[in-house]
Design a protein with these regions (language model features):
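Aromatic- and Gly/Pro-enriched helix-to-coil junctions and flexible linker segments
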Residues: 16-128
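Positively charged n-region of N-terminal signal peptides that target proteins for export
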Residues: 1-4
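Hydrophobic h-region of N-terminal signal peptides that target proteins for export
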Residues: 8-18
Length: 128
C-alpha cells in the first residue's frame, strides 16, 4: 500500500512539474510575445475569425502558433529557434523583405519585427 501511495505522489509531482514550464510559457506568450506579434502577424494569421488564417497558420493562441500551418513544419520547435518557422520567417521579414518566405511579406501593410523583438522571440523559443 505504501508503494502505491508513493507511486501516486510521484505521478502527481511529475505531472505538476511538466505543467509548470507550460504555464510559464503561456504567461510569457500572453504578456510579452503575442502583443508584439499581433501588429506584425495577426492580420493575416488569425485576428479575424471570419477569415481563414493564411497558410493555415493561426497565431492567436500559443498552442496554434506552436503547431504551425499547413506547410513548413512546426511554428515553434521548443529549444531551437532556428528550426521554428515562426522565428525563421519573422527573421527573414526583418532582414530580407525580398525573400518570398519573409513575414510579414513586403507587400503587407504591417511592419516586421524589430531586432529587439526578434531577440525576445528567440529567447522565448529557446527557454527550457
Amino acid at each position: 500500500m505504501r508503494h502505491l501511495a508513493l507511486l501516486s505522489l510521484l505521478v502527481t509531482a511529475s505531472a505538476y512539474a511538466a505543467d509548470a514550464p507550460n504555464a510559464a510559457r503561456e504567461k510569457a506568450w500572453k504578456a510579452d510575445i503575442f502583443p508584439m506579434l499581433e501588429n506584425s502577424c495577426a492580420g493575416c494569421h488569425g485576428k479575424d475569425p471570419a477569415k481563414k488564417a493564411k497558410g493555415g497558420y493561426n497565431i492567436m493562441t500559443l498552442e496554434s502558433a506552436a503547431k504551425g500551418g499547413k506547410e513548413n513544419g512546426d511554428g515553434i520547435t521548443w529549444g531551437n529557434a532556428a528550426k521554428s518557422t515562426l522565428y525563421k520567417f519573422s527573421e527573414l521579414g526583418a532582414t530580407n523583405r525580398d525573400d518570398e518566405m519573409a513575414m510579414p511579406p513586403k507587400k503587407a501593410k504591417s511592419e516586421p519585427l524589430t531586432k529587439d523583438q526578434l531577440a525576445k522571440l528567440k529567447a522565448f523559443i529557446e527557454a527550457k
